Amino acid sequence: MKMSVNNILQDKRRWTTFQLIAFRISFVFFIIISIPNNPLWYKHVFAIDWLNLDYRDLYDICRFGSGVNWFGRTTFGHHLQGYSIWVNTLFFSVAAGVLWTAFLKLRKRERYEYDKLFYWLNVIVRYRAGLGIIGFGFTKLFPVQMPYPSLGILDTDYGDLTAQKIFWLSFGIVPWYQVFAGILEVGAGTLLFFRKTVPIGAALLVGALGAIVVVNFAYDGGVHVYSSYFVLLSLFLLIPYYRPFYDLFVREIPAKVSLYLPEFNPAFHYFSVGLKAAALFIFVGVFSYLQYIDFRYDPYKQPSSAGVQELRGQYNVTEFKLNGETRPFNPYDTIRWQSATFEKWSTLTFRINKPLRLDLSNGGGDPKRDVNRTFELSGVAGGQRAFHYYADTDNQMLYLEDKYKLFPDPRNVTAGEGGDRGVRNYLTDRTLNDESPAISLEEWMPDSVRHKFADEVNDVHPKARTTRRIREFAKADELAKKETRKRFVVNYAVYDNGNKVILRGVDENRDSLYVVLDRVVKDYKLAPGKLVAGQYD
């Protein structure tokens, strides 16, 4: 297949009326879906500390909401599986295209072609698709998007996992496959920066992201709209290549691609080359380093704080007392713990035979506080509970708070509006009274102890102490005072070289609690490899 570039005034051809109207509609549509529709995005860009970047700073530049949302997020009352904003944008674009055509006819200023405008529209779509998929791909290239299953998840029956969770865990157990997918996405995005490699990059995105769309529909994955977004942009970029591809691969005859390229003066040419080089340096070079730091020290779906070393592992609950009353093992007991796990990070999970509200998120978003990172809880049923804990190792005390939230954090929103700073887990007029915690925040952790954990923002490797993390914690600490969480406190004692753990304390209902845990070693047929996120030793 041969590619030729036509300069201004060369090989000018007259577009058909259909092509002119279709372009006007397409121009409005793709411009709208290629630029941020939320003022908070622009506020975020100007607030970035470029001397102390967090990976999420660049990620939020690459990922943003777009489209016409002035009429809400429904079309005639229907969400359309999340595509309603696209449909509303299309309606708006059709109306704008018709008005554009009518205006030109009234002014008798008919155009015969839009070669130059089509060129610049392609540039905008190329860079939008390229930057977006690079941000998306780095979370796979350094595998943090789909973590390896935690001990609590491994202790969960297969039937108690949602379809989405099963799919994500299927990726999580093969991190090198995630890496391959990340290389594909980042590589395809990089190819879109260069005009001659656009068809390769766009074709790769159609194939890779098209498969992700199908899988997300099959497993209720939740990112089908965003994946479809890149498929749509890539299909648009391939428009000049459809006929040549057909000639080459179907008719098996020589094919020629004719692309329009305006003539630029030398100054503009050097400026554009410099701009492209800067974009590649920041969004490929710097971004890859920042994503590695996140993978190595602060994976965004896993807590960053290390758990108590001597507690880590899986346990059978051999003795359980509530208010001094022994509750023998009974699989139908709705109060007694059935099993328990201490993760390598600061999370305790245990199972009870009681239906609980299910967290249907994918555990993502951008929270910096460990208690708001819920991947080990999201999509997990079977009475599984997960508690983040603060460990006072001097006095062997654990201060635990429930990781489940009535209102999950909004996903994929601009910094400061989601994750920790957008916590909506507050008491409201609509919140049921019986959801109020029996132990208040002040009772749970008195001031005499709280000062030991006041420096939580720095409880991470120095390279991960970004300005964004500091800002998020500053606001999150204030909002945490309004949260509605179940909390309890226990003293822990370790015996028999760590094979037995005894917990004594008060649970979230102010009942005295006494639990004896015996360590158990389970022979799973899979084991984590060397490519493991986080640093917990």
Regions found by a protein language model. Name each.
Residues 310-537:
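Extracytosolic and intramembrane catalytic regions of membrane-associated proteins
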Residues 30-46, 56-60:
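Alpha-helical transmembrane segments of multi-pass membrane proteins
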Residues 70-92, 174-183:
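Individual transmembrane alpha-helix segments
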Residues 111-136:
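Interfacial segments of alpha-helical transmembrane regions
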Residues 36, 147-251:
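Hydrophobic alpha-helical segments
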Residues 127, 131, 263-297:
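Internal/C-terminal transmembrane anchor helices
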Residues 139, 284-312:
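Hydrophobic alpha-helical transmembrane segments in integral membrane proteins
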Residues 106-107, 111, 239-279:
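Cytosolic-side transmembrane helix boundary signature
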